[in-house]
């Protein structure tokens, strides 16, 4: 998959927050934020789907290890609106990644790869990044 933005050497440590703010396209079908070691080893594939791949208004999360996808997790909370500015905050520890959505709802996704640092981020789809911050 071609990516709209790729960043490496992030060295995001457990407990640190990655905030991503951007604009959702007015005709959005889906967008993706990938976090991990590299494009073949992702501790989080975060994929809000407005209407894509048979899903509507659903967040699909997954992992990828050595190029092989894991089992998808579907999160029913969906606060994203086409044409809006939105922000997602992601923190992690040895056990879980915690994803805080724009409406304040939080959910956990297991750190299946036991990553101790996140060095890679990629974004693609119907989402234009305005700001990336580390806290």
Swiss-Prot record:
<feature type="binding site">
    <location>
        <position position="62"/>
    </location>
    <ligand>
        <name>a beta-D-galactoside</name>
    </ligand>
</feature>
<keyword id="KW-0272">Extracellular matrix</keyword>
<feature type="modified residue" description="N6-acetyllysine">
    <location>
        <position position="19"/>
    </location>
</feature>
<dbReference type="InterPro" id="IPR001079">
    <property type="entry name" value="Galectin_CRD"/>
</dbReference>
<dbReference type="InterPro" id="IPR013320">
    <property type="entry name" value="ConA-like_dom_sf"/>
</dbReference>
<dbReference type="GO" id="GO:0005829">
    <property type="term" value="C:cytosol"/>
</dbReference>
<keyword id="KW-0597">Phosphoprotein</keyword>
<dbReference type="GO" id="GO:0045445">
    <property type="term" value="P:myoblast differentiation"/>
</dbReference>
<feature type="binding site">
    <location>
        <begin position="69"/>
        <end position="72"/>
    </location>
    <ligand>
        <name>a beta-D-galactoside</name>
    </ligand>
</feature>
<feature type="modified residue" description="N6-succinyllysine; alternate">
    <location>
        <position position="108"/>
    </location>
</feature>
<dbReference type="GO" id="GO:0043065">
    <property type="term" value="P:positive regulation of apoptotic process"/>
</dbReference>
<dbReference type="GO" id="GO:0046598">
    <property type="term" value="P:positive regulation of viral entry into host cell"/>
</dbReference>
<feature type="modified residue" description="N6-acetyllysine">
    <location>
        <position position="128"/>
    </location>
</feature>
<protein>
    <recommendedName>
        <fullName>Galectin-1</fullName>
    </recommendedName>
</protein>
<dbReference type="GO" id="GO:2000329">
    <property type="term" value="P:negative regulation of T-helper 17 cell lineage commitment"/>
</dbReference>
<feature type="modified residue" description="N-acetylalanine">
    <location>
        <position position="2"/>
    </location>
</feature>
<feature type="binding site">
    <location>
        <position position="53"/>
    </location>
    <ligand>
        <name>a beta-D-galactoside</name>
    </ligand>
</feature>
<dbReference type="GO" id="GO:0005576">
    <property type="term" value="C:extracellular region"/>
</dbReference>
<dbReference type="GO" id="GO:0062023">
    <property type="term" value="C:collagen-containing extracellular matrix"/>
</dbReference>
<keyword id="KW-0053">Apoptosis</keyword>
<dbReference type="GO" id="GO:0048018">
    <property type="term" value="F:receptor ligand activity"/>
</dbReference>
<feature type="modified residue" description="N6-acetyllysine">
    <location>
        <position position="29"/>
    </location>
</feature>
<dbReference type="GO" id="GO:0005615">
    <property type="term" value="C:extracellular space"/>
</dbReference>
<dbReference type="GO" id="GO:0007157">
    <property type="term" value="P:heterophilic cell-cell adhesion via plasma membrane cell adhesion molecules"/>
</dbReference>
<dbReference type="GO" id="GO:0031295">
    <property type="term" value="P:T cell costimulation"/>
</dbReference>
<dbReference type="GO" id="GO:0098609">
    <property type="term" value="P:cell-cell adhesion"/>
</dbReference>
<dbReference type="GO" id="GO:0005886">
    <property type="term" value="C:plasma membrane"/>
</dbReference>
<feature type="modified residue" description="N6-acetyllysine; alternate">
    <location>
        <position position="108"/>
    </location>
</feature>
<keyword id="KW-0963">Cytoplasm</keyword>
<feature type="modified residue" description="N6-acetyllysine">
    <location>
        <position position="13"/>
    </location>
</feature>
<dbReference type="GO" id="GO:0030246">
    <property type="term" value="F:carbohydrate binding"/>
</dbReference>
<keyword id="KW-0964">Secreted</keyword>
<dbReference type="GO" id="GO:0002317">
    <property type="term" value="P:plasma cell differentiation"/>
</dbReference>
<keyword id="KW-0430">Lectin</keyword>
<feature type="binding site">
    <location>
        <begin position="45"/>
        <end position="49"/>
    </location>
    <ligand>
        <name>a beta-D-galactoside</name>
    </ligand>
</feature>
<keyword id="KW-0007">Acetylation</keyword>
<dbReference type="GO" id="GO:0006915">
    <property type="term" value="P:apoptotic process"/>
</dbReference>
<dbReference type="GO" id="GO:0050729">
    <property type="term" value="P:positive regulation of inflammatory response"/>
</dbReference>
<comment type="function">
    <text>Lectin that binds beta-galactoside and a wide array of complex carbohydrates. Plays a role in regulating apoptosis, cell proliferation and cell differentiation. Inhibits CD45 protein phosphatase activity and therefore the dephosphorylation of Lyn kinase. Strong inducer of T-cell apoptosis. Plays a negative role in Th17 cell differentiation via activation of the receptor CD69.</text>
</comment>
<dbReference type="Pfam" id="PF00337">
    <property type="entry name" value="Gal-bind_lectin"/>
</dbReference>
<dbReference type="GO" id="GO:0005534">
    <property type="term" value="F:galactose binding"/>
</dbReference>
<feature type="modified residue" description="Phosphoserine">
    <location>
        <position position="30"/>
    </location>
</feature>
